[in-house]
């Protein structure tokens, strides 16, 4: 299952993750976000979303290790992936049909949100389900 990880770019941005290569994704206080974090597994894909400043999906990451032995403080290590060729701003995400009814908008303050495969594809490649698309992918390789 893919996930959306929200971060405040003035505190820790996608560029910081790229510079560091890997980081522990921590500082989560919300119980529902912690439950979602505990479900993550090694190898799962993530989209990094800048909240507060910029408000856009900006890049990808991958879970490289997970330790949920302490239920109150799961340790998830992520590795930087690729920057999206084109950031996906909040207004565009909100307008996308693939996000209708998403927990991302029902509980906007959650910092860890599960995504469907269709949502991940839309964020990283611009693909709507069953839609034809011309042009290059949004994910730079």
Region spans (language model):
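Pocket-edge structural micro-motifs
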Residues: 6-7, 50, 80
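Short, charged beta-turn/beta-strand-edge "cap" motif at the junction between a beta-strand
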Residues: 49-55
